Amino acid sequence: MFLSCMSLTSLDLSNFDTQLVTQSTSLFFKCQKLEAIYLGDKFSLEGLSKLYASVNMFGNCSATLYCSPATYWASKNCSRVKEAGQAVKPYVSINKTSEYGTLCVPVGSSLVAGSFTGFDKLYQVTNADKNKGTITLTEAKSIEPGVPYVYHRYLEGVDFEGKNDMSVITFEVDAAASSSVTAPKNDGSLLKGTFESMVAKGGSYILQTDGNFHPVAADNTTLKVGAYSAYLDLSSTEIGGGDDGFDEAKVYSMVFENGESTGIDRINGDGSYKGIYDQANLQPKVYFDLMGRKVAAPQKGEIYIVNGKKVVYNK
């Protein structure tokens, strides 16, 4: 199919369905510059391997195979993949411009430096406070199969229109840390993971692009939680919240275990807002949005942080 396509460097076959393929001749043979092949759930490497003509599937091609977390082991153990010695990694598509997101996958990783891309830190949700409207994040050092997480990505200086591919998360699987998991480990967790796309549960909370968890309408039938991601369920009052439960209309922000906020709300000892300041003279050089990011061109009518206070820009 792609025999001797010398100019190919990356190939997206995430929507390719191999179920009806009856013959496959030297699929990626002599694609010498091909570095990455992205495969979807309906791309069966083992199925193609059973076709006699697939014997040269990866001849003279050293591309890394990126597959969905659910099909990782099937792809890794494919006879042709083993024979060719292809590297295999799971990948998850994400919103490339969001600083925070959620992740829940059926395979594990020890997250050794240099073994993962698309995020820089991983957290578990360990508590929620109804009165403060916050959830607490505790840093995780590895990916445990089936456990839901919040990830952070350092995006300062990223050129989203350039060659930087920030639209996927990928990592090396640690076989020793990956048990056989067929369902998320949601028992006792405020953050609930899902391996498949699902309609968001009414009354739950979804992490949105502003870095906060927003409530889902009780009668929701359209808003979805994506595959290999997670949502916040505060229906139980056993952890935080008190006897009165949680306010379903409230937006919940994230704070780290040490009390530091992920957003703009830095609090002084006297309870006043410190805001985000230039460390040289404690004066802001520019406007900041509500996530603490510098804004080069403030928009009229939008809310920003100036001198530690929220203001509406009216110029």
Regions found by a protein language model. Give the residues of each.
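Extracellular/surface-exposed low-complexity segments
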Residues: 59-91
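C-terminal outer-membrane/trafficking sorting elements
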Residues: 126-127, 260-315
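Structural motif
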Residues: 40-42, 66-72, 106-107, 154, ...
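Consensus positions within tandem repeat domains that build extended binding/scaffold surfaces
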Residues: 1-3, 22-29, 52-58
